[in-house]
Curated annotation (Swiss-Prot):
Residues 113-126 have a biased composition (Basic residues). With S4 and S5 plays an important role in translational accuracy. Interacts with and stabilizes bases of the 16S rRNA that are involved in tRNA selection in the A site and with the mRNA backbone. Located at the interface of the 30S and 50S subunits, it traverses the body of the 30S subunit contacting proteins on the other side and probably holding the rRNA structure together. The combined cluster of proteins S8, S12 and S17 appears to hold together the shoulder and platform of the 30S subunit. It comes from Burkholderia multivorans (strain ATCC 17616 / 249). One of its GO terms (cellular component) is small ribosomal subunit. Keywords: Methylation, Ribonucleoprotein, Ribosomal protein, RNA-binding, rRNA-binding, tRNA-binding. InterPro entries: NA-bd_OB-fold (IPR012340), Ribosomal_uS12 (IPR006032), Ribosomal_uS12_bac (IPR005679). Belongs to the universal ribosomal protein uS12 family. GO terms for molecular function: rRNA binding; structural constituent of ribosome; tRNA binding. This is Small ribosomal subunit protein uS12. Part of the 30S ribosomal subunit. Contacts proteins S8 and S17. May interact with IF1 in the 30S initiation complex.
Length: 126
């Protein structure tokens, strides 16, 4: 335990928090190019084929990004926008694709939570 004098001289050093999405480098989103689009399986209690893409960002980072929603149009060389946000049951996936921007289309026939999936409002039937 330090003495008062030692604290006056040095002071306490505050712990710096590590970023959960370092590839964004404090930006809200980053643009990148898909290098590989594939499906992968989640961790133990869950079972599915989750759609993910390996993305080379404009700042040189290469990250794995999750493609949310039902169906997508992405392939190799698609230009995409990624945001932070991990997928709990996919190890190594710390980013999400932004649907409805750049080459990523919005989710078709989406009625609720449309803004999260880049879906336009459906025309009212008359």
């Amino acid at each position: 335990m330090p003495t008062i004098n030692q604290l006056v001289r040095k002071g306490r050093q505050s712990e710096t928090t590590k970023s959960k999405s370092p590839a964004l480098q404090d930006c809200p989103q980053r643009r990148g190019v898909c290098t590989r689009v594939y499906t992968t399986t989640p961790k133990k209690p869950n079972s599915a084929l989750r759609k993910v893409a390996k993305v080379r960002l404009t700042n040189g980072f290469e990250v794995i990004s999750y493609i949310g929603g039902e169906g997508h149009n992405l392939q190799e060389h698609s230009v995409v926008l990624i945001r932070g946000g991990r997928v709990k049951d996919l190890p190594g996936v710390r980013y999400h694709m932004v649907r409805g921007s750049l080459d990523t289309q919005g989710v078709k026939d989406r009625k609720q939570a449309r803004s999260k999936y880049g879906a336009k409002r459906a025309k009212a039937a008359k």
